[in-house]
Amino acid sequence: DAKLSTLPVFKSKLYRDENMNMRGMDFEAMRAMLLDTAERLGMDTDNLVITDDTPSAEMQAATVEKFASMGEEVPDGYFDPTSLIVEQDGIRIEVVPAMNAIITFDPAKVFPNGLGFHYYSPYEDVEKTAEYIKEEYKELLNMYNPITDINGGDYNIYGERGVDLCFYDGAEDLTQRIINYNFYYTSFSCNESEELFHVCVHNCDLSDKVGDYPIITAKEAKKLLLSGNFVTSVPYDFPGGEYVKKVELIYRTDAGYYIPYYRFYVELPEAEREGGMKTYGAYYVPAVKEEYIENMPLWDGSFNS
């Protein structure tokens, strides 16, 4: 069990205005991340042309016409840019408001020596390719101690198990390691031909720290779970404590705040598939002590998230 007494809570700088337009972006920081990512990929940063996602004049005109056909006007700020983009030599980078750098390769990158994977590849294939990626893309990863995180494990209707490949920096400090795992990580995705075509560098802005808050243990969180204090999107009644199979400490975004939660994986008897394949639902319990939370999420049997 993790020996932690407190964890930080952060406030997101991003929000939606009255017209549901994204606001709070730091375009200067986004530009810096864009150029830094391009440099780490070996792109010629002196000759990059930075664009944004502002719709073309033709698209704007079509949108205005569509709104007019419904007797409405386009809301203020509807066409404002939200991301920055560069493209060069088959590499495209887009930095979005959440401070993620989304990288696409066209054509996709072919791995050497029979390496490579796709979403439903065996775990061993992903693991072998991860070691190659860790070395080949070390400049992009920019981590002192890159930890391989092969996560997922869901099965489709054909019994194929899907996994995702990520890396995060394994800091010595446990709190920082949790922060890195949740907010500062890089994911790699391959196409069906097992070629690398997509990378996402996550670098969330956590500069607005609310404070460090006392947290409960996983055992205490399970007691709250069993008493109905949780948040879930599972459409069934909670089946009982004997169906709780796993717990992990993660962060969720609630009303603009990044808050630590315990995520419990619970077997769902109603959702068991043919052949005895199990289905699990995620149930979330706040890790912050109850006296610091204004409204504990009490389960009322409704479909919530």
Protein language model annotation of sequence segments:
Residues D1, E242, I250-R252, E290, ...:
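Generic ordered-secondary-structure signal
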Residues D1-I178, F303:
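Preferential activation on post-signal-peptide N-terminal prodomains/segments
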Residues G90, P97-N100, S189-E195, Y257-I259, ...:
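Short, solvent-exposed coil/turn segments at beta-strand boundaries
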Residues G114, H118-Y280:
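Segments that shape or occlude catalytic/ligand-binding pockets
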Residues G276-G281, V285-Y292:
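Intrinsically disordered, low-complexity regulatory tails
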Residues A287-S305:
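Short, low-complexity, Pro/Ser/Thr/Gly-rich segments in the mature regions of secreted, periplasmic
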